[in-house]
Amino acid sequence: MAPVKISHVVSFSSQDPKYPVENLLNPDSPRRPWLGCPQDKSGQLKVELQLERAVPTGYIDVGNCGCAFLQIDVGHSSWPLDRPFITLLPATTLMSLTDSKQGKNRSGVRMFKDVDFLAPASGELWDRLRLTCSRPFTRHQSFGLAFLRVCSSLDSLDDSVVGPSALLSSVLNKIREFKTCFFSWSLKKMELEFSPLLLSINLNDLQFAADAEVSTVSNCMFISIALQSAMIIF
């Protein structure tokens, strides 16, 4: 599993100037936590983080600092601001009710992996994380996270990831190969069975249609079906 760098903080709800949210950007530095502002009594903290690239999430290490519950949602930096994120890790307990009320055992480390993630988001490529930390039982103490470490399910970040554009290009190439073979076979068949009719057919027009550049898979499929129909008519 390859570690994924958190490139920057997109937004946050609250921070203590002495323990800012930027402390989460480097989990391997001498650890200083991210804590909410001492005057913030809402009992909830939120932060949105940008990853260096979109990757499938293998596991997430979380160092706790007084947070009772944690939820992790994922999304894409290209999404509009009003589009809701998808839940990767549902609200999960980091402290017991008793410890949270008494302020005991505030520190701890949890590893969340594939079996903890929800199916709609697990295994997909994401480059945004949105963390929601909450401590509803007592609000007189600051809380937050000690560190956050994200790892991809890829063995290396140099591994190729097939995205939509690469997949589309592959499909288009396959369709073009099919059309070339189809025309070669069809013209030979027509030459054997309908040689008198070939005199009245403009083969250049047909070949032009076969070689025409297309931009979407749907257009390719439409042209292929139309050309096959033309062969049946002839």
From Swiss-Prot:
User: Which InterPro entries has this protein been placed in?
Assistant: Galactose-bd-like_sf (IPR008979), Xrcc1_N (IPR002706)
What are the protein's GO molecular function terms?
A: damaged DNA binding
One GO BP = single strand break repair
Stored Pfam families: XRCC1_N
Q: Name one GO cellular component term.
A: nucleolus
Q: Name the chain's protein.
A: Protein XNDC1N
**Species this chain originates from:** Homo sapiens (Human)
